[in-house]
């Protein structure tokens, strides 16, 4: 039995946005919390780095829209505590053909949940956004709540807040062994720790930690090319021109999204919501970078629809997605060890939802009643994960 001073209420593995918000909620509730990160902070090896992410209430699934109501409140609270701007409201423009079922469902969801939005005809789109070239029959849905989260600033603010609340953040410590039990023992490259509860938010490394615990999630790890495109006239796609974030539906097998210029002067982020299979340990090997089909898709898209951008990317960065088969999150306890909690499979859309995800993982780790219905996020929805894996 660990001495009381060496015993943590909870250990969180992974200091990306989900792990940081989990540790933040634990520390807010005065729990003795240790946040472990295998890389030295800050780093760009996972899914939470970079300067910006889209924030929105526009979702196909009504449960995400409900969660986003509270997410906005917690983002604002963190912004107030940090004393720095973490969010900018720009609006989010969803584009698609008038008959696009996804667009119709999102609009119905926004109406049902009384989220302020506008439906824009082709003519209205041309008048408001003349530097978008639209196919015939294309319409728009503007989610007024949409905008940009300053990702790196948010991570730094969270890590500072965790420390100020008495939590401990230890980076450069890779977890090499987890021993379950009434107390969970976590062994890193530096030392061993014990805790009453363990939360695993390890992104594309999740299954490496779970396999020795007798379970493997159906997770697909992808390397994403995050592309930036140069404006021909600086500022033409900027916030100063009231240009919004956008999400284009139905043109390709996966969505194309964009954010107004800001991260790099004169460059606009436009990326494809998909990528190539990649082991997170090998994502930057030359062999992992041979397939640039998504960049070619984007070049064609930019040439055809964003005429004031040069159609060759000026900057290409990498990011990891960890996708589930249905692209919904995994927020659940280990089927055998109820003091081990798993947060995984954020499928490229988890950053904005992290304030509530962290709250849910905190509640699960402390054996509290979750604030939300977790049916969409249960491990049991994957029938292949039966008792044979345990």
UniProtKB/Swiss-Prot annotation:
Expression across tissues is: Expressed in the liver and kidney.
The EC designation for this entry is: 1.5.3.1, 1.5.3.7
Q: Which cofactor does it need?
A: FAD
Q: What class of enzyme is it?
A: oxidoreductase
Cross-referenced InterPro entries? FAD-dep_OxRdtase, FAD/NAD-bd_sf, MTOX
Catalysed transformations (reactions): sarcosine + O2 + H2O = formaldehyde + glycine + H2O2; L-pipecolate + O2 = L-1-piperideine-6-carboxylate + H2O2 + H(+)
Q: Which GO terms describe its cellular component?
A: cytosol; peroxisomal matrix; peroxisome
Q: What is this protein called?
A: Peroxisomal sarcosine oxidase
Which family does the record claim for this protein?
Belongs to the MSOX/MTOX family.
Identify the SUPFAM superfamilies for this entry. FAD-linked reductases, C-terminal domain, FAD/NAD(P)-binding domain
PANTHER family according to UniProt: PEROXISOMAL SARCOSINE OXIDASE (PTHR10961:SF46)
Localization per Swiss-Prot or TrEMBL: Peroxisome
Q: Which domain of life does this protein belong to?
A: Eukaryota
Which keywords describe this protein according to UniProt? Acetylation, FAD, Flavoprotein, Oxidoreductase, Peroxisome
Question: Which GO molecular-function terms appear in the entry?
Answer: flavin adenine dinucleotide binding; L-pipecolate oxidase activity; sarcosine oxidase activity
Which residue ranges does the UniProt annotation give for the motif Microbody targeting signal?
388-390
Residues bearing S-8alpha-FAD cysteine are 319
Q: What does this protein do?
A: Metabolizes sarcosine and L-pipecolic acid.
Question: Cofactor: bound how, per the entry note?
Answer: Binds 1 FAD per subunit.
Provide the primary localization. other
């Amino acid at each position: 039995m660990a001495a009381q001073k060496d015993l943590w209420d909870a250990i969180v593995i992974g200091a990306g946005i989900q792990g940081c918000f989990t540790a933040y909620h634990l520390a807010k509730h005065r729990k003795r919390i240790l946040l472990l990160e295998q890389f030295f902070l800050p780093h760009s090896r996972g899914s939470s780095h970079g300067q910006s992410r889209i924030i929105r209430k526009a979702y196909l699934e009504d449960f995400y829209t409900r969660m986003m109501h509270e997410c906005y409140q917690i983002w604002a609270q963190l912004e107030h505590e940090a004393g720095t701007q973490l969010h900018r409201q720009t609006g989010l423009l969803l584009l698609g053909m008038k008959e696009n079922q996804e667009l119709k469902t999102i609009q119905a969801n926004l109406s049902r949940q009384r989220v302020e939005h506008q439906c824009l005809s082709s003519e209205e789109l041309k008048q408001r956004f003349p530097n978008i070239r639209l196919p015939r029959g294309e319409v728009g849905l503007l989610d007024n709540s949409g905008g940009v989260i300053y990702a790196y600033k948010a991570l730094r603010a969270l890590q500072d807040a965790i420390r100020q609340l008495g939590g401990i953040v230890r980076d450069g410590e890779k977890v090499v062994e987890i021993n379950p039990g009434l107390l969970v023992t976590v062994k890193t490259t530096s030392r061993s720790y014990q805790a009453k509860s363990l939360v695993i938010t390890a992104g594309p490394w999740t299954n490496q930690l779970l396999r020795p615990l007798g379970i493997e999630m159906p997770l697909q790890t992808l390397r994403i090319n995050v592309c930036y495109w140069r404006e021909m006239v600086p500022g033409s796609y900027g916030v100063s021109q009231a240009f919004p974030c956008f999400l284009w539906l139905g043109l390709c097998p996966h969505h194309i999204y964009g954010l107004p210029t800001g991260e790099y002067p004169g460059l606009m982020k436009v990326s494809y919501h998909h990528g190539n299979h990649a082991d997170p340990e090998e994502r930057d090997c030359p062999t992992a970078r041979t397939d640039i089909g998504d960049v070619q898709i984007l070049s064609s898209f930019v040439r055809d629809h964003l005429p004031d951008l040069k159609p060759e990317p000026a900057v290409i960065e990498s990011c990891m997605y960890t996708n589930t088969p249905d692209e919904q999150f995994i927020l659940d306890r280990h089927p055998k060890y109820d003091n081990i909690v798993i947060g995984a499979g954020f499928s490229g859309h988890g950053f904005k939802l992290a304030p509530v995800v962290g709250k849910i993982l905190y509640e699960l780790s402390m054996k509290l009643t979750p604030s939300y219905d977790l049916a969409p996020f249960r491990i049991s929805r994957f029938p292949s994960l039966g008792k044979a894996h345990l």
